[in-house]
Amino acid sequence: ANLDYDMWLGPAPQRPYNAKRVHYLFRFFWDYSAGQLTNFGAHHLDIVQWGLGMDNSGPLAVEGTARFHKQRWYEVPEWFELTYTYPNNIHVLCGQNNGTRGGVEFQGTRGKLFVDRRRIEADPPELLKQPLGDKDTRLPVSTNHHANWLEAIRAGRLPICDAEIGHRSATVC
């Protein structure tokens, strides 16, 4: 395949060609990304924003810690843990730790929910079997982002994740 590396770099700082700086691994260099937090974070943290009813807002505070590659293969952290504090003292934990659970964990008084792009788990498992009440938050169902976007255009309404919601979810990253 032919790659116009100068075109690919665009407005990013000029760097000598390095195969690690193009797809997929470009995500691990500060010039182009902030690692898995900005790669997958928008997907996971979008669920947080929905679930907490904060699509038009965000966390009040963020605290975290990170570890970088000892060999310095990449620039961004190889491991991180973040704690987001939302109104009403709600805490959301998000992290990446070398192939283990990368996703979002909700902690409540009755247990925990873990959500990633493939699954939802509960501790205790019975939490997932409890029916939702009339006032409980119900998230939109979307099996195909592109189809939802095209349907919204045809119907003249906003998609499940409009530009403002997407912006706020990305900002949380």
Model feature map: region roles:
Residues 1:
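Basic phosphate/pyrophosphate-binding loop/patch that engages nucleotide-derived ligands
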Residues 6-88:
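Rossmann-like dinucleotide-binding domain that binds NAD(P)(H)
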Residues 14, 53-54, 112, 155-159:
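Short, well-ordered loop/turn and helix-capping segments at boundaries between secondary-structure elements
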Residues 23-31, 127-132, 149-157:
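Short glycine/proline-rich turn/loop motifs
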Residues 35-38, 42-49, 143-147, 164-173:
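A structural signal for well-ordered alpha-helical segments within the folded catalytic domains
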Residues 37, 138, 159-162:
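Alpha-helix N-cap/helix-initiation motif
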Residues 66, 76, 83-143:
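NAD(P)-dinucleotide binding in Rossmann-like oxidoreductases
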Residues 75, 152-173:
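C-terminal helix-rich "cap/oligomerization" subdomain common to oxidoreductases
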